[in-house]
Design a protein with these regions (language model features):
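N-terminal low-complexity, Pro/Thr/Ser-rich intrinsically disordered segments
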Residues: 30-50
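Short, surface-exposed binding/anchoring microloops in extracellular/periplasmic proteins
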Residues: 45-88
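Positively charged n-region of N-terminal signal peptides that target proteins for export
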Residues: 1-12
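Bacterial signal peptide processing site
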Residues: 25-27
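C-terminal motif of bacterial Sec signal peptides marking the signal peptidase cleavage site
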Residues: 20-23
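Short, solvent-exposed, Trp/other aromatic-anchored flexible loops in extracytoplasmic proteins
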Residues: 94-148
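Short, low-complexity, Pro/Ser/Thr/Gly-rich segments in the mature regions of secreted, periplasmic
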Residues: 146-157
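Beta-strand elements of well-folded, non-transmembrane domains
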Residues: 59-61, 73-77, 89-91, 122-124, ...
Length: 157
C-alpha cells in the first residue's frame, strides 16, 4: 500500500515538472517572437498599410515629464483573426513595448458584436521627437495572412 502511494507521488511530481518545463518553453518562444518583431520594426523605413484597416496614433501629455502614447486599430467591420500587434518607439527605455497576441493569446474580431478594434498603449518620458512604429499581423476572412507596418512621427510642442 505504501509502495502505491510512492508511485503516485512520483507521477504527480513528474507531471508538475512537465508543466513547469512547458511553461518555460512557451515564455522563451514568446520572447523570441517579440524580439524578432522588434528587430523587424526597427528596420522598417516606410508604411505598408492594410486595406480597410484604420490606424490612429495618439499622444497625450500626462505630466510635464511623461506622455501616454497609443495606437488605435479600427477594423471597420472587417474580420481580423489571430491578431498580433507590437508598438515600438525609437527611445531607450527599460520598459517593454506594448503588444497583443505575442505573450498573451491571439485576439480575433470576427462578429459584429465584437469590439471595433484594439488599443495598444504605453508610457514614455517626454522627448522633442519620437518615432512610433506599429506591426500588425492578422488573418482576414478569406484566411489570407496580412502583415502591415505603420509609422508616426511625434513632434513635442
Amino acid at each position: 500500500m505504501c509502495y502505491g502511494k510512492i508511485i503516485s507521488m512520483k507521477k504527480v511530481m513528474m507531471f508538475i515538472i512537465c508543466l513547469f518545463l512547458c511553461g518555460c518553453s512557451s515564455a522563451s518562444s514568446s520572447r523570441k517572437v517579440y524580439n524578432e518583431y522588434v528587430d523587424t520594426l526597427k528596420g522598417v523605413k516606410e508604411e505598408k498599410m492594410c486595406s480597410g484597416i484604420e490606424v490612429t496614433f495618439k499622444v497625450d501629455e500626462i505630466t510635464e515629464d511623461y506622455i501616454n502614447y497609443y495606437a488605435l486599430i479600427n477594423r471597420n467591420g472587417n474580420v481580423m483573426k489571430n491578431i498580433q500587434a507590437l508598438l515600438i518607439h525609437d527611445k531607450e527605455t527599460i520598459n517593454s513595448f506594448p503588444s497583443i497576441g505575442i505573450y498573451d493569446e491571439d485576439v480575433s474580431l470576427i462578429n459584429e458584436e465584437d469590439k471595433i478594434g484594439v488599443k495598444l498603449s504605453g508610457y514614455l518620458e517626454v522627448n522633442e521627437n519620437t518615432i512610433f512604429k506599429l506591426l500588425l499581423k492578422y488573418v482576414d476572412k478569406d484566411n489570407v495572412k496580412k502583415e502591415c507596418y505603420y509609422i508616426y512621427n511625434y513632434q513635442h510642442n
